[in-house]
Design a protein with these regions (language model features):
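Catalytic cores of nucleophile-dependent amide-cleaving enzymes
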Residues: 139, 143-150, 237-345, 570
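Caspase-like cysteine protease fold
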Residues: 136-151, 265-286, 290, 348-415
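Eukaryote-biased recognition of C-terminal alpha-helical segments
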Residues: 610-655
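Amphipathic alpha-helical repeat scaffolds of TPR domains
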Residues: 398-426, 452-483, 504, 508-529, ...
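A domain-level signal for caspase-like cysteine endopeptidase catalytic cores
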Residues: 113, 154-264, 310
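Helix-turn-helix repeat elements of alpha-solenoid scaffolds
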Residues: 416-448, 487-502, 533-547, 587-593
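Boundary/activation segment at the start of structured domains
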Residues: 2-5, 117-179
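Non-catalytic, solvent-exposed interaction/assembly segments
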Residues: 1-133, 162
Length: 656
């Protein structure tokens, strides 16, 4: 992924945010980077800007606006905005500096104070001299990738929790008297975006409950429907599909979203941004406030500002101001094709764990390249809070999603293998290919620095690849039968060899990783093709045991639990490398049982740590203890000490 080079640009004026019209006579203070403040003006009268924006609405006063006129307005407005931004010396300097960097996305955080400034479509800016891509739209030019988001000024920073398990609410409304909305197309796009994390089932009917755990759909929704849904479920993403409409409040024009008024007597109701924000940020029965991370307003004019004379802003502004970190909206009418592209691009990329700033840039370029989308690229407006640790949160979320995707693939392989016989097992092999490619890509994205954190991250990713190879080997071994038995067993042995070597490589990255070296020893103990090492395997055993014993004294309960899990396994392996003699079996079995009980005492009987350790000893009992009487006695003691769980254990939850 690209690094993000952030430029914060603030445009401010004196006085309240409302009650002022745009005027060339009004000076605005700009703050950018570490440079001194500068002063700019907007060379547009308020009514002139409104007229120009009206001509970008495809139809005005009942008459269609020609494509030529729309393009001319875009060019003229883009040039005006470009001239305004060119008068901010710090912005020009910072963009020039960013142009010399490689593999970087420039992110402009635009913060404005003044409702009249929110009317200005900064997103259509044409790059002036000194900016990348001179003469082209700055946000779609190909020289230097640039993304622009808006942000509301706040008293204190808004917390962002990006790394959450996704749960999507899709609410659409098509009450009587309004034209259809592309609900089916949007639902297909959302369903497709979620596909990598939907567990495989043999029939579509069996998959429906799995989808419903991740996607809630409100048909012809009312505001109360949205409020109830947000009160009972913690959604990470909310996708609203409806028409936008003007409404008059105190004689002033405002924009709202058209929802259904009532299911018993359906009718259109124009809901303003503040009412929608209150529904999205409702308080649940346990006292927690609903807080989606991102809200997509697939409605016309959701980012458009009505009269600047009254408090409040656009729908997107109000939702963002209420505490929603990311709001994706349109400041002009958006085509159906454009709204579908928005849904496909945003959710498929964000759910994969791409940086949302990069997704905004790619989304705008996709809209710009799609002739069907007209000027939807200019309509796209994004309000966003980007804390300093957002990149780290995105990386953590990408790891979560990758592991969850691999969990689903292994579950699919196991379920399919139960039904696959002979040639039918080829479909399972294709799943193995997908697992390997997913983890290969994940490993390739690991940090390359030489610090301890980067090394730990690389070790974890390499270890995940190793664990996958081991799991694949066991699945292959379990289904080695018939004419293909020898080939399947050979593939299983090759997977075990790869797993063993990867575990050793993981330990080489992080010498405190007792889990990786223990798995390396485990596979050397059970795999005929042992690895020749500079140290004897009995010495590696001593190293692993010493590290685990040290970490058993850790104050962190999670680290202690995993250390005891390693100790339980390493004691068993002592018989394989001559560290223990047969007459010590009873004592070692008692010691292993004690370690297993300690794990349950630290983390709980139904904890991930207990379940993962039990699964590992079940492998020894099933696959590797047939000719090892000491192992049989020790695994029996371990399994008796480890409580059984009725909950499933995701494969990547515990990667040994």
């Amino acid at each position: 992924m690209r690094d993000v080079y952030t430029i914060r640009l603030e445009l401010l004026r004196f006085g309240p945010a409302h009650n002022q019209l745009l005027s060339p006579l009004t000076p605005y203070v700009t703050l950018c980077g570490n440079d001194e403040p500068a002063s700019v003006t907007i060379p547009l009268e308020h009514h002139h800007l409104l007229n120009r924006l009206e001509r970008l609405r495809y139809v005005t006063d009942g008459a269609p606006v020609s494509e030529g006129q729309r393009k001319a307005e875009l060019r003229e407005l883009g040039s005006i905005v470009g001239r305004v931004l060119a008068n901010v010396p710090a912005l020009t300097a910072l963009l020039g500096r960013a142009s010399g960097l490689t593999n970087v996305l420039v992110h402009i955080q635009l913060v404005v104070w003044g409702s009249e400034l929110a009317l200005v479509p900064f997103e259509i800016v044409t790059a002036p001299q000194g900016f990348p891509g001179v003469g082209s739209p700055l946000l779609t030019q190909g020289d230097v990738p640039v993304a622009l988001t808006r942000e509301v000024r706040r008293e204190r920073p808004l917390a962002v929790e990006w790394d959450r398990a996704p749960r999507i609410l899709f609410a659409w409304a098509e009450p009587p008297g309004v034209s259809r909305v592309p609900a089916r197309e949007h639902l297909i796009a959302l369903r497709h975006a979620l596909e990598p994390w939907i567990p495989w089932r043999p029939t579509p009917e069996l998959r429906v409950p799995e989808v419903q755990q991740r996607l809630t759909v409100l048909h012809n929704a009312t505001l109360d429907d949205i409020r109830r849904a947000c009160r009972t479920t913690s959604f990470t993403h909310v996708h609203l599909l409806a028409h936008g409409a003007e409404r008059t409040e105190a004689g002033e024009r405002q924009y709202g979203i058209i929802l259904n008024r009532d299911h018993r007597q359906p009718a259109a109701e124009v809901v303003d941004g503040q009412a929608l924000a209150q529904a999205l940020r409702v308080t649940s029965q346990d006292g927690k406030v609903s807080r989606p991370t991102a809200v997509t307003l697939a409605t016309c004019d959701s980012g458009a500002v009505g009269s600047p004379l009254t408090p409040g802003g656009s729908i997107a502004h109000d939702v963002h101001a209420s505490g929603v970190p990311w709001v994706i909206a349109s400041q002009l009418p958006m085509t159906i094709a454009g709204s579908v592209t928005l849904t496909e691009c945003w959710y498929s990329r964000v759910l994969m764990g791409e940086d949302p700033r990069s997704v905004v840039h790619e989304l705008r370029r996709s809209l710009h390249a799609d002739a069907r989308a007209k000027h939807d690229w200019a309509s796209l407006a994004v309000y966003a809070v980007t804390p300093p640790d957002l990149s780290a949160q995105v990386t953590a979320f990408r790891s979560r999603q990758t592991k969850a995707r691999v969990d689903v693939l292994f579950d699919k392989a196991e379920r399919m293998s139960e039904q696959a016989v002979g040639p039918g097992f080829e479909t399972v092999r294709k799943v193995f290919v997908e697992i390997r490619q997913t983890l290969k890509d994940y490993r390739a994205e690991a940090p390359v620095a030489d610090g301890p954190e980067a090394r730990r991250e690389r070790a974890e990713r390499i270890g995940l690849n190793a664990a996958a190879e081991k799991r694949i080997a066991l699945l292959l071994r379990a289904h080695a039968a018939g004419d293909s038995r020898q080939q399947t067993e050979r593939e299983s042995d090759e997977s075990l060899t790869r797993a063993r070597d990867l575990y050793h490589k993981a330990f080489s990255e992080d010498w405190t990783n007792h889990w990786a070296i223990t798995q390396f020893l485990s596979l050397n103990a059970v795999h005929a093709n042992r690895s020749g090492e500079e140290l004897r395997l009995s010495d590696w055993w001593t190293v692993a045991r010493s590290i685990a014993l040290q970490q058993c004294r850790d104050t962190d309960p999670v680290s202690r639990a995993w250390a005891f899990a390693t100790l339980a396994e390493i004691e068993l392996l002592g018989f394989a490398f001559g560290n223990y003699a047969a007459e010590q079996t009873v004592d070692i079995a008692a010691r292993v049982a004690r370690h297993c009980r300690t794990i349950a005492e630290i983390m709980g009987e139904d904890s991930l740590h207990v379940r993962a350790t039990r699964r590992q000893f079940e492998r020894y009992a099933r696959w590797w203890s047939a000719d090892k009487p000491q192992w049989q006695q020790i695994t029996a003691a371990a399994l008796q000490a480890l409580p059984q769980s009725r909950n499933d254990l995701h494969w990547t939850s515990a990667i040994p």
